[in-house]
C-alpha cells in the first residue's frame, strides 16, 4: 500500500496512491460510512489497525483528488540523520570515514513535498543534495536491540538531504545551520 498526503483546506490530508490516482481517504470513507485515519499521523498511531481500515478503501474507490502533494510526513517529533553514511560520499567530501555514525538533526520546517520547489538563498552558492532512504518510525524506540529495531519502523520513503556547503564549512564543519533551511528535506512521493 502506498500512503500519501495532499493539501486540503491548508492542512495535510491522507491519500492512497493507486493506479487510478490518489484516493481521498476521508471522502471515500465518508461515502462508504466507515472510519479511517484523517492524516498520516493518525494512520501511524493506529499501526496495523489503521492499515486494515485503509486497505479496503482502494478497492472500487470513487473519490479521487488532484490536490497538490504535501510532505508524506508533517507531524514529526524529530528528524534524525546520519552523516557520512557511506564511503564514497565521505571521499567526495574529502573527509575521513568516521569510526562511528555521525548523527545530526533537521527540523520540521525543512520538510517539503516531493516535487516542491525549494527556495535557494542568494547568499550561498555551494548547494549539494544527497538521496536518502527515510525510515518513518511507528512508535517510540529507546534501547532497542538490533533484532527488534525494524519492528519499530512504520514504513519507508525517499528523501533528499539538501545542504549549503559554503555555510557548512565556513563555520568549522557544523551541520545544523547548513541543512535546516525551509524545504531542505524533501520527502516522498509515498510511504510504503
Place the predicted regions along the sequence by residue.
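N-terminal non-catalytic cap/leader segment that marks the start of a structured domain
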Residues: 1-101
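Glycine-enriched loop-and-adjacent helix/strand subsegments that border the catalytic/binding cleft
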Residues: 76-192
Amino acid at each position: 500500500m502506498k500512503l500519501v498526503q495532499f493539501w486540503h483546506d491548508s492542512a495535510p490530508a491522507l491519500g492512497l496512491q493507486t493506479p487510478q490516482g490518489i484516493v481521498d481517504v476521508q471522502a471515500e470513507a465518508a461515502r462508504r460510512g466507515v472510519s479511517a485515519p484523517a492524516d498520516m499521523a493518525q494512520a501511524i498511531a493506529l499501526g496495523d489497525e489503521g492499515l486494515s481500515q485503509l486497505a479496503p478503501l482502494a478497492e472500487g474507490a470513487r473519490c479521487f483528488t488532484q490536490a497538490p502533494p504535501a510532505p508524506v510526513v508533517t507531524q514529526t517529533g524529530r528528524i534524525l540523520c546520519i552523516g557520512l553514511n557511506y564511503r564514497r560520499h565521505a571521499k567526495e567530501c574529502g573527509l575521513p570515514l568516521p569510526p562511528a555514525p555521525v548523527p545530526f538533526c533537521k527540523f520540521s520546517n525543512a520538510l517539503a513535498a516531493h516535487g516542491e520547489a525549494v527556495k535557494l538563498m542568494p547568499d550561498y552558492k555551494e548547494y549539494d543534495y544527497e538521496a536518502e532512504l527515510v525510515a518513518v518510525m511507528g512508535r517510540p524506540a529507546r534501547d532497542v536491540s538490533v533484532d527488534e529495531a525494524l519492528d519499530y519502523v512504520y514504513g519507508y520513503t525517499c528523501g533528499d538531504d539538501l545542504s549549503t556547503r559554503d555555510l557548512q564549512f565556513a563555520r568549522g564543519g557544523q551541520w545544523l545551520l547548513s541543512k535546516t533551511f525551509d524545504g531542505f528535506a524533501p520527502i516522498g512521493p509515498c510511504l510504503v
